[in-house]
C-alpha cells in the first residue's frame, strides 16, 4: 500500500523514537528500633524525622531495655505483637533491642536500607557506654547481620532524667529531629562509609556548634558502689558514680560538652592489630 504523505509535504520526516520508561526512584527503607521501648517519645520523634525521607518500620522492645547492650534472648521464647501507636502500626517485641533487630530481619523478613536506633533518652558516649547501651547494641547487631546502623542519643542535663517514664518524658526533641533527618539524609546520599559498621551520633541537650567527627573516650562515669540496708538490715548495692567533666579534645565526651554533635564511626573489629607483634613475641618466640 502506498504511503499517504499528504500533510507532511515541505517538512522533514519526524523520527518516531520509542520512549524508555523513566527509572523509578526507589524510596529507602529503615528499620527503626531503640532500647527505651516502643512507646518512648524519643523513638517516635525519630519516626517523625525519618518518615518524610524513607519508608519506616518500627520494631522495638515492648518495655524499657536500657543498658542491656547486645544481650540476646536464647533461653526464652520471643513474642512479637503488632500494635498501633500514634496511629502507626508497629511491632512490640518482648525482648531486647538485639532481639527486635533479629525479629525484624528474619521473622518479619524486612530488607531495610539501614537500621536506625534511637533517639535514646540520655547520651551514649565513650567505650564504656557503647558496650552497655541497648541503643548502640541494636545498631551493632544490625551491622553484624549485614545492615549498617546509626545510633542516635540525646544528652540529658540531669542524669536522673534517664530513669523517668520514656512514654511521657518532657525533653524537647525539636533540634534532635532535625539532626536525625539531616544525618540520615547525608548517609543515604553519600553511602555508608565502607570502613565503618556503625555511626554513633550524640546530640547535646543544647546544640551550640556543628558536627564533629570524634573518637570514643574510654569512660563516661567514675565508677562507684553505694551500699545500703534494706528494712531487714541486709545490705544491697547500687552501682553509680558522677560523670567525667571532660575526656580530652577529639573525644565524643569533649565534643558534646562543648555543645557539638558528636559523630563517631565504630567498627565491629575489636582486634588490637597494633599489638600483634608484641603478642607474637610472647607466644611464638
Task: Show the residue positions of the predicted features.
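A cross-family phosphate/adenosyl-ligand binding-site feature
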Residues: 25-30, 41-107, 111
Amino acid at each position: 500500500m502506498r504511503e499517504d504523505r499528504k500533510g507532511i509535504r515541505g517538512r522533514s520526516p519526524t523520527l518516531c523514537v520509542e520512549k524508555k520508561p523513566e527509572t523509578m526512584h526507589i524510596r529507602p527503607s529503615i528499620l527503626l528500633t531503640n532500647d527505651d521501648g516502643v512507646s518512648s517519645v524519643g523513638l517516635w520523634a525519630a519516626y517523625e524525622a525519618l518518615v518524610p525521607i524513607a519508608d519506616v518500620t518500627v520494631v522495638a522492645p515492648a518495655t524499657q531495655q536500657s543498658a542491656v547492650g547486645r544481650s540476646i534472648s536464647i533461653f526464652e521464647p520471643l513474642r512479637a505483637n503488632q500494635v498501633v501507636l500514634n496511629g502507626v502500626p508497629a511491632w512490640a517485641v518482648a525482648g531486647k533491642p538485639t532481639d527486635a533487630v533479629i525479629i525484624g530481619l528474619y521473622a518479619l523478613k524486612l530488607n531495610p536500607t539501614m537500621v536506625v536506633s534511637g533517639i535514646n533518652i540520655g547520651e551514649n558516649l565513650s567505650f564504656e557506654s557503647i558496650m552497655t547501651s541497648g541503643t548502640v547494641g541494636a545498631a551493632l547487631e544490625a551491622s553484624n547481620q549485614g545492615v549498617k546502623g546509626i545510633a542516635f542519643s540525646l544528652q540529658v542535663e540531669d542524669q536522673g532524667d534517664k530513669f523517668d517514664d520514656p512514654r511521657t518524658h518532657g525533653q524537647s526533641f525539636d533540634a534532635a529531629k532535625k539532626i536525625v533527618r539531616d544525618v540520615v539524609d547525608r548517609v543515604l546520599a553519600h553511602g555508608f562509609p565502607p570502613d565503618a559498621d556503625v555511626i554513633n551520633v550524640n546530640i547535646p541537650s543544647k546544640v551550640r556548634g556543628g558536627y564533629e567527627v570524634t573518637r570514643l573516650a574510654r569512660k563516661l562515669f567514675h565508677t562507684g558502689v553505694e551500699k545500703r540496708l534494706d528494712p531487714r538490715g541486709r545490705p544491697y548495692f547500687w552501682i553509680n558514680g558522677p560523670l567525667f567533666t571532660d575526656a580530652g579534645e577529639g573525644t565524643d565526651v569533649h565534643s558534646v560538652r562543648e555543645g557539638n554533635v558528636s559523630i563517631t564511626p565504630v567498627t565491629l573489629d575489636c582486634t588490637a592489630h597494633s599489638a600483634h607483634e608484641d603478642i607474637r613475641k610472647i607466644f611464638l618466640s
